[in-house]
């Protein structure tokens, strides 16, 4: 809901919004409830990491102000993932290498265009053989460290599991949850 509200506020400031959806899960009614104008929102199916980065590069060339929302990095495959087999070792670190190259190429053009790139990602459990590493770094984010070096602000949102943490509207529709927020640069 936070990303949808950010998109709605960007539209109110006459900023173009490109929404990359890799999960095919965004509901237009949900976006409208958040305040988005669907007529002015550019919805793009995120076919691959390369496709998202190339499309952003192309849109930056239009000279318009942009908010790019990528939902989500974790579930967007690389071209190699799509073309390859199911063996995870065959494409190990491929997404991280593509992101590293893409972010080094796009960081300055994004800044010069006064654009914003909002990347949604997910926390995954750090599966490691080292107990000390598992305790100090219990979670990792997909895509390697490339985004760690590229972001100007990282917002960690972790939810509470209790039903009491749910926020409902006047009709009983769940519109959110209480979360813990950690800001990081």
Show where each model-derived region lies.
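Motif I (Walker A/P-loop) of helicase-class P-loop NTPases
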Residues: 1-7
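Conserved inter-motif catalytic segment of the P-loop NTP-binding fold
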Residues: 5, 13-101, 105
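Carboxylate/His-rich catalytic cores and anion/metal-binding grooves
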Residues: 10
